[in-house]
């Protein structure tokens, strides 16, 4: 037997003993009819109190005679005979309580307070003061148990280090780790900031179907479900693009959606099967307008949320106050694989040889454009650390993008990269219904040849285009990856509250 098994058994026994003790305390409360009271009203938050009163001296606080009411989780407690200090945590942070036996109703201190446990949720009322060490505190005149916690805090609240537990039991992670709480506050600010920015630019927020008869808008493997009443298979959306462009056909010239997408693919530090994107579409614009808009969006968000356009991510520093770098796909390949030249990339046989030398398995169904894209991903993508727009994507890998007027082999499309990963994708939209129909047909051929990420043929979308889509540009940005940048997080699971996990057996 390993040394770890007796330790695990001992920990389980200790936990069971503590659970039993706490359940017995709850039974006593139930007997008194005060197990889970709901009549305590909180009036103050810890961060607001610190912001307003941290700068004041104790003499000022005594003169002001400020009465406050707080509530939160008991994180620490130091009992020193007739008096104790408690750390109370609420949504804003933490504040210290000073609890004296003589200042509470008779029996509360010894018969109730001392029997409470870390993790219990308390309500407290009292006067603000500062301790001899200068810490803002509340001298309690009332203290009540609002919720009895039956399970102990993780590791006696020295933090929750186990990654698996952090993701599976996010509530424990949020209780124990200040950084996690900060990350998800920033995520909320990013969502709010995007909405404010888009509304200010004249965009209307809309909602489109998450269950679709025909999945479209991206090349990905969808999740399949079955609608019992209609007796048809349906798909969780991989992107909202085709529905949003239908709205532009209908006359809503600037629309956006913050949406959940689902792709039945692998899980990695950069990928979660369920993820959040923002997509926008604007009529009478092209991909160059989107480049300007993207730079402005990132600059606005960083300055508003982080207080600076400069973001520190690991050992890298990004300045979103400056224009992003711009390279064509072929330029990027040649830059990061100098032995390659553009003429070789434009020659099918030579491009295949380059791809195979890089360990890329070239499929028979791939054309030259797909091979070029695979070479780019293998040679250049990980080197795009500073914010960079990559342009001139081949039409073969851009089935919804408008062809370039001067070179129909490529499209008016870009992807932008930060920290070696793709953050977003934008292009001038294909509004030629006949060209779109042919590209859908090409995608169907690719699917029949074994490409399970190729798109379906969407006849209704073709019908919509036949009614006329004005010149339009569209952009999609991965919210999760954006939040990773803004919070210096290096795995996508750290910025998704409840990431996909394999069930515990």
Curated annotation (Swiss-Prot):
Entry GO MF terms: ATP binding; lysine-tRNA ligase activity; magnesium ion binding; tRNA binding
UniProt record similarity statement: Belongs to the class-II aminoacyl-tRNA synthetase family.
GO biological process: lysyl-tRNA aminoacylation
Statement: the UniProt record of this protein carries the keyword Magnesium: yes
Binding site for Mg(2+) 1: 415, 422
Record's keyword terms, sorted: Aminoacyl-tRNA synthetase, ATP-binding, Cytoplasm, Ligase, Magnesium, Metal-binding, Nucleotide-binding, Protein biosynthesis
Organism whose genome encodes this protein: Yersinia pestis
Primary localisation category: cytoplasm
Encoding gene per record: lysS
Catalytic reactions of this protein: tRNA(Lys) + L-lysine + ATP = L-lysyl-tRNA(Lys) + AMP + diphosphate
The name this protein goes by in its record: Lysine--tRNA ligase
Pfam families noted in UniProt: tRNA-synt_2 (PF00152), tRNA_anti-codon (PF01336)
This protein's record includes keyword Ubl conjugation: no
């Amino acid at each position: 037997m390993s040394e770890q098994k007796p330790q695990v058994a001992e920990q389980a026994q200790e936990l069971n003993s503590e659970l039993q003790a706490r359940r017995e305390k709850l039974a006593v409360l139930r007997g008194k009819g005060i197990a889970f009271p709901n009549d305590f009203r909180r009036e103050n938050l810890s961060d607001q109190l610190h912001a307003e009163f941290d700068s004041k001296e104790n003499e000022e606080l005594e003169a002001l005679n400020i009465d406050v009411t707080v509530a939160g989780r008991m994180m620490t407690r130091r009992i020193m005979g007739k008096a104790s200090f408690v750390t109370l945590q609420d949504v804003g942070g933490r504040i210290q309580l000073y609890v004296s036996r003589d200042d509470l109703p008779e029996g509360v201190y010894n018969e109730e307070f001392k029997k409470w446990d870390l993790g219990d949720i308390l309500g407290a009322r009292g006067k603000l003061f500062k301790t001899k060490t200068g810490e803002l505190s509340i001298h309690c005149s009332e203290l009540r148990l609002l919720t009895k916690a039956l399970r102990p805090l993780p590791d006696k609240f020295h933090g929750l280090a186990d990654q698996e537990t952090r993701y599976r039991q996010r509530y424990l992670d949020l209780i124990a780790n200040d950084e996690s709480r900060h990350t998800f506050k920033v995520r909320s600010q990013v969502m709010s900031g995007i909405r404010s920015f888009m509304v200010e630019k004249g965009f209307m927020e809309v909602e489109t179907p998450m269950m679709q008869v025909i999945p479209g808008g991206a090349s990905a493997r969808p999740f399949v479900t079955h609608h019992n009443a209609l007796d048809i298979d349906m798909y969780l959306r991989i992107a909202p693009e085709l529905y949003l462009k239908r709205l532009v056909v209908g006359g809503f010239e600037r629309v956006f959606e913050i949406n959940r997408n689902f792709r039945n693919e692998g899980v990695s530090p950069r990928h979660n099967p369920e993820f959040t994107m923002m997509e926008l579409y604007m009529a009478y614009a092209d991909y160059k307008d989107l480049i300007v808009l993207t730079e402005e969006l990132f600059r606005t968000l960083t300055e508003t949320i982080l207080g600076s356009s400069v973001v520190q991510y690991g050992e890298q520093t990004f300045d979103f106050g400056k224009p992003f770098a711009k390279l064509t796909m072929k330029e990027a390949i040649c830059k990061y694989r100098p032995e390659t030249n553009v003429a070789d990339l434009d020659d099918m046989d030579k491009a295949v040889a380059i791809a195979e030398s890089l360990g890329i398995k070239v499929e028979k169904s791939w054309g030259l454009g797909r091979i070029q894209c695979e070479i780019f991903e293998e040679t250049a993508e990980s080197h795009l650390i500073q914010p960079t727009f990559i342009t001139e994507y081949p039409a073969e890998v851009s089935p919804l993008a408008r062809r370039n007027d001067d070179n129909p082999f490529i499209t008016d499309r870009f992807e932008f990269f930060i920290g070696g990963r793709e953050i977003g994708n934008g292009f001038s939209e294909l509004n030629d219904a006949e060209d779109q129909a042919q590209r859908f047909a090409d995608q169907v051929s690719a699917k029949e040849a074994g490409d399970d990420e190729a798109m379906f043929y969407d006849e209704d979308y073709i019908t919509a285009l036949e009614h006329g889509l004005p010149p339009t540009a569209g952009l999609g940005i991965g919210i999760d990856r954006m939040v990773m940048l803004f919070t210096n997080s290096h795995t996508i699971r750290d910025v998704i509250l409840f990431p996909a996990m394999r069930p515990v057996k």
